[in-house]
């Protein structure tokens, strides 16, 4: 059987505000990321784990004021409520021209968010060169 060797270097990692990764594979993706884009409140989790997001994207309803004040140059505010923060972060990566993506933290916590994020994955896949959604399981 042939082993598939994934190369995570140079990819953009979008971190949603679900369960923060704790296993080696997703954490390796974060370490090797070209860019780390936090979906709103996921910035809290990244910072709590000593990881600085390059960008924080969303409607900012889950982002503490202290982070807004500390990192204003990293924040991309999108007020529209027709899409979730993961979709907003995905659009942001498209505007930047980043087309090799890894999505972390898109499952757990809320079942409705998990199902919505999984449903959007096929839509995203049509617009980029490569995309992976990785969990701890």
Where are these regions (language model features)?
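Short phosphate-binding loop-to-helix
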Residues: 72-96
């Amino acid at each position: 059987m042939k082993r598939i060797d994934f190369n995570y270097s140079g990819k953009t990692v979008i971190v949603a505000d679900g369960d923060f990764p704790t296993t080696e594979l997703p954490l390796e993706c974060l370490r090797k990321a070209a860019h780390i884009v936090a979906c709103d409140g996921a910035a809290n989790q990244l910072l709590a784990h000593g990881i600085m997001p390059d960008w924080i994207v969303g409607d900012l309803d889950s982002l503490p004021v202290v982070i807004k004040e500390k990192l204003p140059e990293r924040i991309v505010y999108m007020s529209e409520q027709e899409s979730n923060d993961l979709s907003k972060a995905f659009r942001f990566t498209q505007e930047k021209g980043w087309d090799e993506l890894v999505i972390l933290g898109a499952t757990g916590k809320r079942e409705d968010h998990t199902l919505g994020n999984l449903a959007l994955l096929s839509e995203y896949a049509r617009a980029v060169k490569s995309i992976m959604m990785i969990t701890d399981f």
